[in-house]
Amino acid sequence: MTIAIGKSSKEPKGLFDSMDDWLRRDRFVFVGWSGLLLFPCAYFSLGGWFTGTTFVTSWYTHGLASSYLEGCNFLTAAVSTPANSLAHSLLLLWGPEAQGDFTRWCQLGGLWTFVALHGAFALIGFMLRQFELARSVQLRPYNAIAFSGPIAVFVSVFLIYPLGQSGWFFAPSFGVAAIFRFILFFQGFHNWTLNPFHMMGVAGVLGAALLCAIHGATVENTLFEDGDGANTFRAFNPTQSEETYSMVTANRFWSQIFGVAFSNKRWLHFFMLFVPVTGLWMSAIGVVGLALNLRAYDFVSQEIRAAEDPEFETFYTKNILLNEGIRAWMAAQDQPHENLVFPEEVLPRGNAL
């Protein structure tokens, strides 16, 4: 028997190694180095949103009521963007605008920048969490790569778009009805639905939903009998460790339905990853274009002909008129700081008015 005589290998751990051991320890909820970014930012972002929707008015920024305290409900409450006069100020609590006054900070819209910036870093922290966990259990990082899609959309809509405009005022406020208002704004002022990047985004998201439904149904349809007898919900109580569904049967079925079918599971699942993530990225790229006020398709020849010929109209020209109506109504209501006043005869009227 050989006895090794020498210095003990157990040296005292440094601060970094001790922190690494604690952060990456196996526990019910993994923390990790990414958790140092994720958990505080997510906590502050959600806390700011709950605080704002419960107590904080938008009277000073938008001339609106936006909190439960003022009578709003879950669908109409929001954390509103700062006033347009504040441009792209970070609105730090200790900054020159609020000067440490918390009430004044809330009135100025400071909670919006607080929620938006902490929310963006929380999403980035969540993506890093997926990278970190994948590395620790020796998985490839496709989950984290896929999550780049939602991050790209959030950053482009809530941060890049208002940075390209005159201020945070033109970003979406954080609320359900507020997001609907923002969608109408995008349509009226940017003709967003005719933008090819929006079309690619819709194709990606709805296509992914279709793929998900088809894939789930096909796997359920081709589950192997596992000896327990027929059970519609066999997926919930599997008793076999090996592969549970037949790719060959699924391939045969869809070959007969469409004439083509996936023959490789890896290609099938990569396609299910590729379609929604690409759609989200295309939407994000389109919103960056809108930040720079790039136009969607303009079919000027149809507009000119419609102006000259009362009998000529297309769905495009009708939509252009609808957009003009949105702008006429929205500009005065949505941008009170501009003091816009339109003559009554130029405003579209509905039956209720």
UniProtKB/Swiss-Prot annotation:
Q: Which domain of life is it from?
A: Eukaryota
Membership in a protein family: Belongs to the reaction center PufL/M/PsbA/D family.
Instruction: Give residues where Phosphothreonine occurs.
Output: T2
Question: What is this protein's gene name?
Answer: psbD
- Residues bearing N-acetylthreonine are T2
What other remark does the UniProt record contain for this protein?
2 of the reaction center chlorophylls (ChlD1 and ChlD2) are entirely coordinated by water.
Could you tell me what this protein is called?
Photosystem II D2 protein
Task: Provide the binding site for pheophytin a.
Answer: Q130, N143
Matching SUPFAM superfamilies, A to Z? Bacterial photosystem II reaction centre, L and M subunits (SSF81483)
Q: Which species expresses this protein natively? A: Physcomitrium patens
Q: Name one GO molecular function term.
A: electron transporter, transferring electrons within the cyclic electron transport pathway of photosynthesis activity
- Major localisation: plastid
Known EC number: 1.10.3.9
